[in-house]
């Protein structure tokens, strides 16, 4: 029987995460799918080592850091047209046994599912809210402004859907850290929008799938653990502005009319200010953490 699955992951100096990803993938499905690593300029040798070690793993160099969505699109274009499902996953994901087979089984239960996502666990075992509503202007702004200072605010709660029952259901969008995507659905919307260098590309992807008549389905019986931000967390001064630019792009795309120009202007200005505040806070926190690491006598307790 010809394989149903192919796997795409984007690498950027993934370190030991990549080996964990590949070794746990082996017990996540009874198939042995081809894995394409779209490499955006790794310098740690991890993708090359995996390419040499595993016969079913292929290294595809993108020629530079072209962003997450752009790299996914490049790799997807290399997949044989007979493949029914494409797994799109970060390389810092670890699969629970049988989890990918669970996603495929759910896809068979939901023939209009364009994308299906597992329950995503944090490294400490807590559940990450990976199945959410598409943010409108109200919930998006409310979450952006209040999410960190008032986590239980109604806009964040509505957006993150943390109070929803953990059941298999259709949702607005799914975390791009791990997705099973029906190839027909991917092709229908021409994959990811490469204008999103990083962040919000999964929100945009899920929203466009929904508008094209497909469903985004959350499948909590499938479980993965996500290390989260092995590359992004090291450089908040680069990544946080990228996140805010993508948030603006998402809302600007959905409010394109001339009479909405004041709204776009306000969004751009507000997000730019928030980005600067977030970067300053992250840099201070990084310096504090580094100082605590260098000086063990410094207490990590504080009045936050």
State where each predicted segment sits:
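A conserved acidic beta->alpha catalytic loop
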Residues: 24, 39-47, 64, 96
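Short beta-strand-to-loop acidic/aromatic patch adjacent to the donor-nucleotide binding site
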Residues: 82-94
